[in-house]
Amino acid sequence: MKGKSLTAQLKKASSASASTVADRLVTLRSERGFSQARLAELAGVDRKTINRIENGHFSPSLDTLTRLSVVLKCRLSDLVEAKRTKR
């Protein structure tokens, strides 16, 4: 892309990814009636980790995303892809 450095492009993509995961995790957790503490307990992670993910301050590892998807009974892609709106 002309005019933008690779570093700027990567930073923008990373920020968008963190925002998507944050939004999806909040939505899925709420839909299933879990508190941050309960989700963290079941997934074997710290509650602060859930909070940091949901606030977009932490990019979870693949292992953490997998644990969350198992507990939330969803596909991994449900956590990392923006929800599509129906037309």
Predicted regions located by residue number:
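N-terminal flexible/basic segments that precede or flank functional cores
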Residues: 1-32, 37, 86-87
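Helix-turn-helix DNA-binding elements, focusing on the entry/boundary residues of the two helices
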Residues: 25, 36, 47, 62-65
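Alpha-helical residues within the helix-turn-helix
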Residues: 30, 41, 70
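Residue-level detection of the helix-turn-helix DNA-binding "recognition helix"
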Residues: 30, 44, 55-57, 84
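Short alpha-helical DNA-recognition segment
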Residues: 33-52
